[in-house]
């Protein structure tokens, strides 16, 4: 079942976001294995990211094998992060 992971970093900037992507992805437009969609934007008071994964297992593998070992990233996100996650029960596209 597809899985959604959302992170919000209060006070984070686009520069923090780009530093994290550079440290954790193989390229700026190459999604990690299992990630289907990636959305990110500045909210005015931080960075909000929502990633859609093919499964919770793929998401967990990325977090455990790539994201956590890469931390802390120089110039990356400040802590703490606000996290929400869910299995996707409805997916409608135009």
Describe these PLM feature segments.
Residues 1-50, 54-68, 75-94:
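Short S/T/G/P-rich N-terminal loop/turn motif that feeds into the first structured element of a domain
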